[in-house]
């Protein structure tokens, strides 16, 4: 039996059901007016409810509980769809498409549609790259597509993995910080004019075309449109898995869920009543106000296995632990 924070269990409820693992979740509700939190047991299975000796809730209590669950589910959805900073396409040395929608797969500068065949190669025949080794490994592991890491080469087309996709890929806090630092370095170079000459050359060519004949104008226009794209750097922020796959190719590798018979875990709980029979506990940053007390009591028990989140997505780490216990 495994103890874990209530919000981690709640986020993982669907995957736990697929694994045929029972859930005993003690929910919590914050009362208005600064009153003390009140705790109500939520019984995920009749068998566990009877074991813990918890009584059947009244009809009004069930309605309140249902409303709380709906609210929590809405909050969860908002968290998972949160937009990180710098959510639009950024151009270094070339102008990005200002009207590009975040999810349509269009790449600024080249005008290409990723869904229409840009794939892993991107616009102008160049391949997409990422900013850290951890992100490259996560993409290859999840989608089976090998992607290179940016090595300060110019030109380049860079994928910035944003907040919601970071969680989907299970990127650690250290990995997120490393990507942020590399982005800052690139923007610092842009500010210092590292790529300014490339843009300036393109601008001069564009002005010349007004004085040439029609044939020369066409040639100059073609060269001008290609010059910034060839010399500059494009950074494309990506929030969704769908857009990422349209850019790099590949498909998500879906592993068959591990059933209860293949996992040592039969029950997960955040109830302090289950501490005595728990064999392991998993702790992570949580909004469960009662988890601190549960974890403290569990740590006093002899011969109990303790696991702690490494700073990545708590749900991903929790399910990984269950599958390997």
From Swiss-Prot:
Q: Name any GO cellular component annotation.
A: viral inner capsid
Q: Where is the composition biased (Gly residues)?
A: 106-122
Q: Subcellular location, in the record's words? A: Virion
Q: Quickly give the catalysed reaction.
A: ATP + H2O = ADP + phosphate + H(+)
The entry's ATP-binding residues are 106
Described function: ATP dependent RNA helicase essential for RNA packaging and viral transcription. Possesses ss- and dsRNA-binding capacity.
Quaternary structure and interacting proteins, as annotated = Homohexamer.
Q: What is this protein called?
A: Helicase VP6-A
Lineage per the UniProt record: Viruses, Riboviria, Orthornavirae, Duplornaviricota, Resentoviricetes
């Amino acid at each position: 039996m495994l103890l874990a924070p209530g919000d981690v269990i709640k986020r993982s409820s669907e995957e736990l059901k697929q694994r045929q693992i029972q859930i005993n979740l003690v929910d919590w509700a914050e009362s208005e007016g600064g009153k003390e939190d009140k705790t109500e047991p939520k019984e995920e299975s009749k068998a566990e409810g009877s074991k813990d000796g918890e009584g059947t809730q009244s009809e009004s209590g069930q309605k309140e509980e249902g409303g709380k669950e709906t609210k929590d589910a809405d909050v969860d959805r908002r968290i998972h769809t949160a937009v990180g900073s710098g959510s639009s396409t950024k151009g270094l040395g070339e102008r990005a498409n200002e009207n590009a929608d975040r999810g349509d797969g269009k790449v600024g500068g080249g005008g290409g549609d990723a869904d229409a065949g840009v794939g892993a190669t991107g616009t102008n025949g160049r391949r997409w790259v990422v900013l850290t080794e951890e992100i490259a490994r996560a993409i290859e592991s999840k989608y089976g597509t090998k992607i290179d890491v940016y090595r300060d080469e110019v030109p380049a087309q860079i994928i910035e993995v944003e907040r919601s996709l970071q969680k989907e890929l299970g990127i650690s806090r250290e990995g997120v910080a490393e990507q942020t630092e590399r982005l800052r370095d690139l923007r610092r170079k842009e500010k210092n004019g590292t790529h300014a000459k490339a843009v300036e050359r393109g601008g001069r060519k564009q002005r010349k075309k007004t004085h040439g004949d029609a044939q020369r104008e066409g040639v100059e226009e073609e060269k001008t449109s290609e010059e910034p794209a060839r010399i500059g750097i494009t950074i494309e922020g990506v929030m969704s898995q769908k857009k990422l796959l349209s850019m790099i190719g590949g498909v998500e590798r879906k592993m068959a869920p591990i059933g209860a018979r293949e996992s040592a875990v039969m029950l997960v709980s955040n109830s302090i009543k289950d501490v005595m029979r728990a064999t392991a506990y998993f702790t992570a940053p949580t909004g469960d106000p009662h988890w601190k007390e549960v974890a403290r009591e569990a740590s006093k028990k002899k011969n109990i296995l303790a696991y702690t989140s490494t700073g990545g997505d708590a749900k991903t780490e929790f399910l990984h632990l269950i599958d390997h216990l």
